[in-house]
Amino acid sequence: MHSRLATARLYLCTDARRERGDLADFADAALAGGVDIIQLRDKGSAGEQRFGPLEARDELAACEILADAAARHAAMFAVNDRADIARAARADVLHLGQRDLPVDVARAITGPATLIGQSTHDRDQVSAAAIGAVDYFCVGPCWPTPTKPGRTAPGLDLVRFAADVAGAKPWFAIGGIDGLRLPEVLAAGARRIVVVRAITAADDPREAAAKLKSELLAAI
């Protein structure tokens, strides 16, 4: 699993797309375009606003859809925040925020096979993640984003810092990244990115993913 993480470049966060009812088709398209890791994150989504928070059984059902799609495309499936859901869904990856479970507690729940990542938003957090127990970390937001309302964006300066201190540990730039902004992110030193709307809001998710992946691979 660590070798797959090392080669991963494009990480997608998607909601359950309840208002559209097309999660399976969307996931297949995005993964066919080159997404390496696909994560379910329904917080603040249009579906949550319309239908309310995703219940645990519905979250597991959505996880099963994404896990099956990821397996078909030799990609990895990630769960956000919830170590119990990650274990029940047999997720490849669990992603934690700074205020979520400590990494050692989460790993005790998921088991050793599940990779664990963590969000970082300042230099101290980046430095800690670079030498800590997480398998990868995310750096940002690079720009303000509606998926994290009210959060100050540390910007590309933090990406440059991560590029200097991360060493061999995989890390991903995150926050407001799309095809137009990707060259700036690459110039700052990132070689892996997390995206949301750049693919979820695209008319052709497969094409959007393929374009991003092509630019990422060209920068290696």
UniProtKB/Swiss-Prot annotation:
It holds the Pfam family TMP-TENI. 4-amino-2-methyl-5-(diphosphooxymethyl)pyrimidine binds at Q39, L40, R41, D42, K43, N80, S119, K148. Pathway: Cofactor biosynthesis; thiamine diphosphate biosynthesis; thiamine phosphate from 4-amino-2-methyl-5-diphosphomethylpyrimidine and 4-methyl-5-(2-phosphoethyl)-thiazole: step 1/1. The keyword Transferase applies. The keyword Metal-binding applies. It catalyses: 2-[(2R,5Z)-2-carboxy-4-methylthiazol-5(2H)-ylidene]ethyl phosphate + 4-amino-2-methyl-5-(diphosphooxymethyl)pyrimidine + 2 H(+) = thiamine phosphate + CO2 + diphosphate; 2-(2-carboxy-4-methylthiazol-5-yl)ethyl phosphate + 4-amino-2-methyl-5-(diphosphooxymethyl)pyrimidine + 2 H(+) = thiamine phosphate + CO2 + diphosphate; 4-methyl-5-(2-phosphooxyethyl)-thiazole + 4-amino-2-methyl-5-(diphosphooxymethyl)pyrimidine + H(+) = thiamine phosphate + diphosphate. Its EC number is 2.5.1.3. It is an enzyme of class 2 (transferase). Binds 1 Mg(2+) ion per subunit. GO terms for molecular function: magnesium ion binding; thiamine-phosphate diphosphorylase activity. Belongs to the thiamine-phosphate synthase family. NCBIfam families: thiE. Condenses 4-methyl-5-(beta-hydroxyethyl)thiazole monophosphate (THZ-P) and 2-methyl-4-amino-5-hydroxymethyl pyrimidine pyrophosphate (HMP-PP) to form thiamine monophosphate (TMP). HAMAP family: TMP_synthase. This is Thiamine-phosphate synthase.
